[in-house]
């Protein structure tokens, strides 16, 4: 994998930094694992904008990813590593011994031809998945479930990982990249290793249009709006907004805690670093 800075042959190329992976599959994705993906433009069923800065972008197919890794005891082989437009990580097409194919997240160092397996008896190696109760303390893992059988929810993006730092009774304690320490049931599954494509963070899109290709619309500052649109709007001439920074709905934006799920507070051992 190489990081390439483009030559400034045009204003749009001047600041582009690409991450090039020559090992990615160059053909079409596996058709049986594709699903339709319709765009909402950030609107809900009544037509109102519920998510700002969303709209347009290239048409995409959704890749059906196996986040549960529940084919226990059946050996599989990585057929190829593919690009996925729906996430920062790359994905791997794996072929199981019974003939079934599935997409999984491609772990760091995973390549075509690698053997992988899920379940309690699996070898401790990158790409293999098993419950946290069988994973050695100190291991680096990704694609971690929060509820047994629900599918991976933690550490799924490019370069992500968590570390298993303790196991006590029915819960394992994980240290997340953010610094948060969290308890997860030991029956939840995790996959050894880090998520691949960690160089994703080094890329630079170089121009606004590249964001538009990805379905991201512009962000307008509150002080540039009218009073009807934002608490910072209005005023004669250029203003500072006149108050501490808030969202369009008046919620403070600088360090204000908005977490309200008290039911799961007991699982957080330490809040994330600021």
From Swiss-Prot:
DNA repair as UniProt keyword: no
Key words of the record: Ribonucleoprotein, Ribosomal protein, RNA-binding, rRNA-binding
CC terms in the record's Gene Ontology section: large ribosomal subunit
GO biological process, one term: cytoplasmic translation
InterPro entries in alphabetical order: NA-bd_OB-fold (IPR012340), Rib_uL2_dom2 (IPR014722), Ribosomal_uL2 (IPR002171), Ribosomal_uL2_bac/org-type (IPR005880), Ribosomal_uL2_C (IPR022669), Ribosomal_uL2_CS (IPR022671), Ribosomal_uL2_dom3 (IPR014726), Ribosomal_uL2_RNA-bd_dom (IPR022666)
GO MF, any single term: structural constituent of ribosome
Assembly and binders: Part of the 50S ribosomal subunit. Forms a bridge to the 30S subunit in the 70S ribosome.
Alphabetized PANTHER family for the sequence: LARGE RIBOSOMAL SUBUNIT PROTEIN UL2M (PTHR13691:SF5), RIBOSOMAL PROTEIN L2 (PTHR13691)
UniProt name for this protein: Large ribosomal subunit protein uL2
Gene name in the database record: rplB
């Amino acid at each position: 994998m190489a990081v390439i800075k483009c030559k400034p042959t045009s204003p749009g190329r001047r600041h582009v930094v690409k991450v090039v992976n020559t090992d990615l599959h160059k053909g079409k994705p596996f058709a049986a694992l594709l699903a339709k993906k319709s765009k909402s433009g950030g609107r809900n069923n009544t037509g109102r904008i519920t998510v700002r800065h969303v709209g347009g972008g290239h048409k995409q197919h959704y890749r059906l990813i196996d986040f549960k890794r529940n084919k226990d005891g059946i050996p599989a082989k990585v057929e190829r590593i593919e690009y996925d437009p729906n996430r920062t990580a790359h994905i791997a097409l794996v072929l199981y011994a019974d003939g079934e194919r599935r997409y999984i997240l491609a772990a760091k160092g995973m390549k075509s031809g690698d053997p992988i397996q899920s379940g309690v008896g699996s070898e401790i190696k990158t790409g293999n998945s098993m419950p946290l109760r069988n994973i050695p303390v100190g291991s680096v893992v990704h694609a971690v479930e929060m509820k047994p059988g629900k599918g991976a929810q933690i550490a799924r993006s490019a370069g992500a990982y968590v570390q298993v730092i303790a196991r006590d009774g029915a819960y394992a304690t994980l240290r997340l990249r953010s610094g948060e320490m969290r308890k997860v049931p030991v029956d939840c599954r995790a996959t050894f290793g880090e998520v691949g494509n960690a160089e994703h963070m080094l890329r630079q899109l170089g121009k606004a249009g590249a964001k538009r290709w990805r379905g991201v619309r512009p962000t307008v500052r509150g002080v540039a709006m009218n009073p009807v649109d934002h608490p910072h709007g209005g005023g004669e001439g250029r203003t500072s907004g006149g108050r501490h920074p808030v969202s369009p709905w008046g919620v403070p934006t600088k360090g204000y805690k908005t977490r309200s799920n008290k039911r799961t507070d007991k699982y957080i051992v330490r809040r994330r670093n600021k």
